[in-house]
Amino acid sequence: MTRRNHLVALAVAIALGSSGAGAAHAAAAQPSAAPSDQLAEIVVTATKRKTLAQDTPISMTVLTAANIANRGLTDFNTLAQGVPGLAMRTSGPNQTEYEMRGLNSSGGNTSMVGVYLDDVALSAPAAEQLGKVIIDPNLYDLQRVEVLHGPQGTLYGASSMGGTVRLIPAMPQLGVFGVSGETIVSNTGSGGSINFAQNGMVNLPFGSTAALRLVGSASSTSGWLNRYVLAPGSVQSDTCATTPCYRPSNFYSAPIISTASGVNSSTDRSFRAILLYKPNDQLSITPMIMWQESSGNAPNAVDVNGSPTNPTMPSPKGHYEIYQTSEPQWDRFTLGSLKVDYAVTPDIGLTSITGLWSNHSLISQDGTEENASSSGLGSAGTAYPYAVNYSNPAYPYPSPSNDGFGGNGIGPTGPGPCGPGVEERDYTRQVSEELRLASTGHGRLHWLVGYYYQDLFSDWDMWSINQQAGPIGNIYVDYMPQTILQNAFFGNLSWEFPHGLKASVGVRWYHYSYSQRNTEWGDFTVYGFNNLLSGAPTVAGNIAPFNTSAGGSASGTNPRFNLTWQIDSEHMVYLTIAKGFRLGGTDQPFVGYNHPETAASCANPSSLVDLQQCGLMYKLSATPTQAGKYNPTGLVNFPNVNSQGVPQFNSDHVWDYEIGTKNEFFQHRALFNLTAYFERWMDPQISTNIAGFGFTVNGGDANIYGLEAAFRAHLGYGFDFATDWGYTHSKFLTNSAIDGIPEGYSVPDTPKVTGSMSLNYHHSLTDNMGVFGNATYSYVGSRYDLPYGVTVYLNNIAQTQLNLPSYGILDLRAGLRTARWTAAIFVDNALNKQTLLDPLPQINIAIPQYTRYIVNQPVTYGLDVSYQFGGE
């Protein structure tokens, strides 16, 4: 973009901001005015009743609308980088799973961190990846964000084993008309270009009893990564015989014949409407609808050089392909909810929250590399020449209109269809109801009882389709619909004793049932593999679909105990013991399990495919015999496999023991909170891998302990300082023959140190004008990941362990503020730190040497202009 175009874009931003039709980073409210001499008190609803954050005996991180706006935060992923003990595994926009206090969600169907929009649960225990993917809502017009550390299973249920995130939207205001808007224009360096965002809010009063709050957002983010198409024969295979043959060690030296720039661009749109009807002091009715759609042209992922223990980005960085394959991503989320609050008596309140939401998503990935070399099919002269030589005249390219992926790709001989790709299509629908009856008075006794119902349906579909007219049609197709029904009753009772002592006890009883069907077919099912490797490839469509089903149910209780000593109005100490859990479920089937044609290979397994189809795993301590055979004494049966070859895994749970203190000093000018915790994670759901197919098993127990600290201070002279830090130490206690993780290893994806520091400044120039600034540094420590689980047959976890470096991000912001206007310049990632965040999960057959990594956005600088009239 030329300098003139940059100036035009900035001028448009200012004009749109002045019209009030723009966007705000946080709530419609402007960032807070000049800080007072004392820290502001924050009201939270973490215990499902209103309390002050400093009076609530829970380790938590709370960001208000002013905090979010002062830092210029626009999405939860950026916010999460500074929350102690909170880790992320991300595949890009709206493809993120959150983990807290060392509890990893790499296995299983359910997130470890419950995410709520107000009181509606968004983290569904759905099948495969979708259950862990949380939408990344725009932080515009949020009243606050509450991050509750540690198990919250008593009040928040199965998906809150590690903690809970509550996104509280700003509510309509009765009798007040208000408009706010903000426009943001920025530029991303290191290959990116112009980004644009607009959000706006309107608060419409209808008399003195009703009001409607409308919120809209739209943004476009430029891509900064490229896609490189390599010369024919550039197949990543350690066995290929073509000349030249570029193997993983020198793959990036292969000739580049085509380049697509900025392929990871994305757009986001969202809308939210909340109606408040309050006819009297006893009753309030609050319906809400929300819609959000996100689309991207490719993940924020690059290929890497080097070994898993020392990965580096090649130059130029990007994704290298055998030929051009587009990788679009798309996600649409729709929610409707109804909240009713009714004061039964002056001291008893009844609350009902009904939620209905659905999510559609599409993820597509390049599958050429994996399909080319999976299970040894990467050699020239094998039964499938397509695996190495895409220009083989025996298997010509179809027309672009038949390629199934939009065409317009670049083949080895010029323009042609896209290459073999993989698509994951997910649909999830959830209906939920929560009914609570609670005391609302100010006496010594406080109580709450409630009921929760969940009806969830999810459909996970995967397509891996060959784009050639040869013998292979569908490489792999899988349909996996699942239903979950859950009922729970919960309650909490607390009593305030003399001398500041307070004791509370809570419990949640739950029962859930699930059923899952699976239909798969294609040559890359394991039964299909058996035919291929025997030298008898079948014509496309001749491998009949393989159908299986499984189900189960379980019940249990989640207790919680708390003892608090309020020493005085500024100092508190508390002790908490709590239990958390997540649901069990089913895996994909072993396709050749108990099949007559696989009996011989199961008796004397000689390949990884044999292990997979027979439901066998290789012990961590065993070693293969010579000639590639697998020593039968070193094999163990996969646990919990039903008669149809479908493995199932049980619920895992955690016991948490923590002691904490919350303190204020210097007449509320400073605070210091500290929590120490110990957790015992029992029967953890761990991902393991056989022949490229991922499975979840219940592994050996793990111990986790750590510290969480928060400090806030009003320093005077216009300065405020805030810092949050967390330390987590974890280790597995046994050498598990099932999950393959050795004793003493830490839990994957768990940085030992996380934290942030933030310095705010405000100085008044006149009575209604001032300047402000903010500098925030966020740090995430080193960790390792197991994106393919532990391929235990390798007998060495280091061969699949991918190390991720520590990183720190510095964000800067400064501007001018009046009563209605705010204008700010900002630099995000000011040090231009580009790092490897996470390995990109492969939805195709998982092969470690083709690992791609998610990377963060390079330095981005821009202008932010906002306006507010009336309301809050």
Question: Positions of the model-derived regions?
Answer:
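Transmembrane beta-barrel wall of Gram-negative outer-membrane proteins
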Residues: 190-297, 332-337, 428-432, 438-454, ...
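N-terminal Sec signal peptide and the immediately downstream disordered periplasmic leader
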Residues: 1-73, 77-81, 203, 281, ...
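Short acidic/polar hinge/loop motifs at secondary-structure boundaries
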Residues: 120-149, 198-200
